Amino acid sequence: IVAHALEYAADRLVITGDLTNLALEPEFELVCRKLREAGLPVTVVPGNHDTYTRGSARERRFEVFLGEFMAGERSEGDYPFIHRQDGVALIGVSTAIPSLPLVAVGRVGEPQLARLGAALERTAAEGLARVIMIHHPVLPGVAKPRHDLLDLGAFGAVIARYGAELILHGHEHRRIEGTLPGPQRPVPVHGVGSGTYLSQKPDRHGAFSLYTVGPAAITRVYHWWNGSRFVA
């Protein structure tokens, strides 16, 4: 993915969670090393697999090992964080919570939602294109029960009040496109396929999206694995 993205002169690699499987320390060590070798700046947020056990959440392994890839402004706590670059505000939100086996739910939480609203308001006043990074799907009906965002409605209420230019999520391992209501116009929501996922289903092949942020719009080109290479 990185080699292909660099061919298009990508400015930054953005990953919306699940960088590990079981949130084990050796996994995080490997991920950290690979991201440092990427050859371009990286921004990440955690997924449910990155807090797979209560111990990993308690020890804050994701933040300890990958904190350098979440550099940005914070009002308090780890999330949300704001990374500003070339007229864009990347706003990293965490939905990662430990859960029971075979359960993959997420939650933003009221304190983080309040800080997210303030971050969206502040970056809008700066005239930045606001791109939210979040792991769990934020569109109703996309995630099945026991795999969904528990406070999806509350998240949607924040977006309805403050808006955003784009919301990126992961979790579902497939391409998803939709919108959430915003204060002035619908807010695009894009699910990003897993870059390493192998499946017989065409819509679940390994994939990534390349975004261009222009003065009037954000455009997306979808790149997917055809069995031997990534193609647009």
Per-region residue spans from a language model:
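Short acidic, glycine-rich surface-loop motifs adjacent to enzyme active sites
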Residues: 10, 123-141
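Active-site neighborhood of phospho(di)ester-bond hydrolases with catalytic His/Asp-centered motifs
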Residues: 12-18, 42-48, 94, 131-134, ...
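Active-site environment of divalent metal-dependent phosphoester hydrolases
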Residues: 21-24, 48-57, 98-102, 137-141, ...
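Residues at alpha-helix caps and immediate loop-helix transition turns in enzyme cores, especially N-
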Residues: 26-28, 57, 104-105, 112, ...
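Conserved beta-sheet core of the metallophosphoesterase superfamily
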Residues: 144-215
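A short C-terminal boundary segment appended to hydrolase-like catalytic domains
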Residues: 213-232
